[in-house]
Amino acid sequence: MFDEFYFRKSLRPRESQNHVRNAACEYILKFMKTEGTIVKTYHLGSSLEPWGRKFHERIDRTVFDQDLTPFVKYTLNKKKRWEAEGNPDILYGLQRSYQNMGVMVAERVSLRSTPHYCIVSINNYYRNFFDQFPIRHLHQLQDHNYQCQSTNSIRGQPFKSLQPENRTPTQVTGHQQESSANVSVAYHIITPPKNYEVLRNKDFRVGHSDRNGIRTIARRRRFQFMKEAVFDLKNEILEDFGDSDDDDENEILLCEESCGPRKFYNLHDHLVKSNHNE
């Protein structure tokens, strides 16, 4: 009876019921409850000639600037009509707006970084940017037929993994399927998963932040490693400085012992005696 009472009292609660542990995660990631971003992009086929900058600016203001400005991040909460994700009617409406172009809607996952504060390399920026947010569902029209490609992973997969030729058990060599449309318009809807607290809870430590404002385990370990490195460096400097002083003192003592006692005389007496002799 005592053992049962002791273990019930001493054991920590489950992670889902551990409110002390979930406090930091819930407080820091509370913005993810209502966060949502939509980005519109267009992609050119390899058969088209490269377009100049002026041509891109012109078509951005005319052809592709019908509802959203391309390559601009919009808050999803302000675009209420995009709440119906995966609705085929949206795709058919977009297809009527963009004749002879491919249209797709990609639902992406934001878990480790937010689209508005994402640090990526400026070289090939948009490719590196979208690599940070894998695709969970890909909606598109093929010959006016609605298709949806999904993944079982809640964290999503890259665009290449969702292609039909890459999902078959046998890879076809020497033949690569090309898109029928030379120009494609894509709408990227970036939202966090519903269970983001469960997926990110292990990144936060128990309790509140310390005096350094450290709330995550990774950042605490990084700061601890930096402190240990600085401490070791200081010890090495002090040890080297102390060893040099000891060596100098030992050299002085050895020199005094080897030279023996020195003979001194008064220079004033020597000068006085010299003057009397003259």
From Swiss-Prot:
Plays a role in innate immunity by conferring resistance to virulent strains of the Gram-negative bacterium P.aeruginosa via the zip-2 pathway and independent of the pmk-1 p38MAPK pathway. Induced as part of several immune responses to translational inhibition arising from endocytosis of ToxA during P.aeruginosa infection or exposure to exogenous cycloheximide. Induction: Induction by P.aeruginosa is dependent on zip-2 but independent of several immunity-related pathways including pmk-1 p38MAPK, dbl-1 TGF-beta, and kgb-1 JNK pathways. Induced, in a zip-2 dependent manner, by translation inhibitors such as cycloheximide and exogenous or P.aeruginosa-derived ToxA. The keyword rRNA-binding does not apply. This is Protein irg-2. Keywords: Immunity, Innate immunity. Residues 163-179 have a biased composition (Polar residues). Residues 152-179 are annotated as: Disordered. GO terms for biological process: antibacterial innate immune response; defense response to Gram-negative bacterium; innate immune response. It comes from Caenorhabditis elegans. Signal peptide: none annotated.
